Regions:
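Substrate-binding/catalytic cleft of secreted carbohydrate-active enzymes
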Residues: 74-75, 84-232
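Secreted/periplasmic carbohydrate-active enzymes, especially glycoside hydrolases
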Residues: 1-91, 97-99, 103-107, 128, ...
Length: 232
């Protein structure tokens, strides 16, 4: 957020020496790294990940938001001091990704593979992931591709599909991370072993226990799984 400087790459199509089409894309020179047990690094320096999740949904409008509503949400996100946003659980407006490039927010983008498994979603999930990556590849704000959220059994099928999605993401974009979100509360579930990062959803103070109980739980995860890159 301190200095989200962007360059511009201008691609021109020429015919007989004249420009007949032109596309301008953002170029942000940055390096993301996550080190297990230590945290997130931006351009080689430790960077705080103060995050929120954002849904593209307003009362009375549903998902059919204008840029005015997108800007309102982003203003609230900036005002609370967030440095990173998860756009869940689906591809959101192209305008949002572009605004996050200019604001210096670090983005988690994902496909709508959530909770339930039918056994028939493989082709659709791969198509949506491929399209998400190809459409959003040039946004420097995006650091990770989300493959699924709290997807439950059948475990063997879901683990295999997650591996194929991870492989697809690495083929399309070998330099960004992948993540799958775990709703089980422990880090060794087979469904969540096939991505670079493991997201952990557990809602202390909401569905169970107290907010303060998250600290010993996280410390236990770090002790038991020191090699895991974890996001909460």
């Amino acid at each position: 957020r301190e200095d989200p400087y962007l360059y511009k790459v201008v691609s021109c199509l020429l015919a007989n020496g004249e420009v007949i089409d032109e596309v301008t894309q953002p170029l942000g020179v940055r390096h993301y790294e996550i080190v297990a047990g230590k945290g997130f690094y931006l351009n080689g320096e430790k960077y705080p990940m103060y995050g929120v999740t954002r849904h593209q949904d307003w009362w009375g409008l549903g998902s059919a938001l204008t840029n005015r509503e997108h800007d309102f949400d982003l203003a609230q996100i900036m005002d609370v001091g967030a440095t990173t946003v998860r756009f869940a659980h689906y591809q959101q407006s192209e305008y949002l990704y572009s605004r996050c490039d200019t604001l210096g927010l670090i983005i988690w983008a994902e496909i709508p593979f959530v909770n339930r498994v039918t056994g028939y979603e493989s082709e659709n999930a791969q198509t949506q992931l491929r399209e998400l990556i190809r459409q959003s590849f040039n946004h420097p704000s995006i650091y990770v591709w989300g493959l699924h959220n709290e997807v439950h059994q059948p475990h063997e099928y879901t683990a295999s599909l997650t591996q194929s999605l991870h492989d697809l993401a690495k083929t399309e974009d070998p330099d960004r991370y992948t993540i799958a979100v775990n709703g089980y509360g422990h880090a060794n579930h087979p469904v969540n072993q096939n991505t670079d990062i493991q997201g952990m959803n557990r809602y202390f103070g909401w569905y169970e226990k107290k907010v303060q109980d998250i600290k010993p739980w996280v410390e236990g995860l770090e002790k038991d799984y020191p090699w895991q890159k974890l996001m909460l």
